[in-house]
């Protein structure tokens, strides 16, 4: 599971996700990538589920790059707790993904295998995505 080793602050503001990603919009390491077309928070569990779906389909052949890391904590108050009395306890970790961001990359497998592996990963994520190929230099 992806979790930061150390953070300066345990609780962070929710923030806004306006516009599209500033960087990481192209396939840089692999041959094919999974690009977000909508914005959302992606949890460390969702990232791990997508990774497992891809690697199992590829039968541990090829290589998978995870280009996002859940560095932001989210909190929740306990069940039956009244409003007020401060912010809740940290519950888990998320990565705010804006549209245009390439989240996963795949290389070392045939195109049909790569596309199917990325399609399986699409179903594990809360954002709409599209499969893109690396541009020829």
Curated annotation (Swiss-Prot):
InterPro entries in alphabetical order: Ribosomal_uL16 (IPR047873), Ribosomal_uL16_bact-type (IPR000114), Ribosomal_uL16_CS (IPR020798), Ribosomal_uL16_dom (IPR016180), Ribosomal_uL16_sf (IPR036920)
An MF annotation (GO) of this entry: rRNA binding
NCBIfam families referenced in this protein's UniProt entry, alphabetically: rplP_bact
Keywords annotated in UniProt: Ribonucleoprotein, Ribosomal protein, RNA-binding, rRNA-binding, tRNA-binding
A Pfam family: Ribosomal_L16
UniProt KW rRNA-binding keyword: yes
Gene that encodes it: rplP
Disulfide cysteine pairs (residue numbers): none
Subunit structure: Part of the 50S ribosomal subunit.
GO terms under cellular component: cytosolic large ribosomal subunit
Keyword Phosphoprotein found: no
Family per similarity comment: Belongs to the universal ribosomal protein uL16 family.
Gene Ontology biological-process entries: translation
Protein purpose: Binds 23S rRNA and is also seen to make contacts with the A and possibly P site tRNAs.
SUPFAM superfamilies linked: Ribosomal protein L16p/L10e
Organism: Leuconostoc mesenteroides subsp. mesenteroides (strain ATCC 8293 / DSM 20343 / BCRC 11652 / CCM 1803 / JCM 6124 / NCDO 523 / NBRC 100496 / NCIMB 8023 / NCTC 12954 / NRRL B-1118 / 37Y)
The protein's name: Large ribosomal subunit protein uL16
Tree of life domain: Bacteria
Lineage: Bacteria, Bacillati, Bacillota, Bacilli, Lactobacillales
């Amino acid at each position: 599971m992806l979790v930061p080793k150390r953070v300066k602050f345990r609780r962070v503001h929710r923030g806004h996700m306006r516009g599209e990603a500033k960087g990481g919009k192209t396939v840089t390491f692999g041959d094919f990538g999974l690009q977000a077309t909508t914005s959302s928070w992606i949890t460390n569990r969702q990232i791990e589920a997508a990774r497992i779906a891809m690697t199992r389909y590829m039968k541990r052949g090829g290589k998978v790059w995870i280009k996002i890391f859940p560095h932001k904590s989210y909190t929740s108050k306990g069940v039956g707790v009244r409003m007020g009395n401060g912010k809740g306890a940290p519950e888990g970790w998320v990565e705010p993904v804006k549209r245009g961001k390439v989240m996963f990359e795949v290389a070392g497998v045939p195109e049909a295998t790569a596309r199917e592996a990325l399609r399986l990963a699409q179903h594990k994520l809360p954002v709409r995505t599209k499969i893109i190929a690396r541009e020829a230099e």
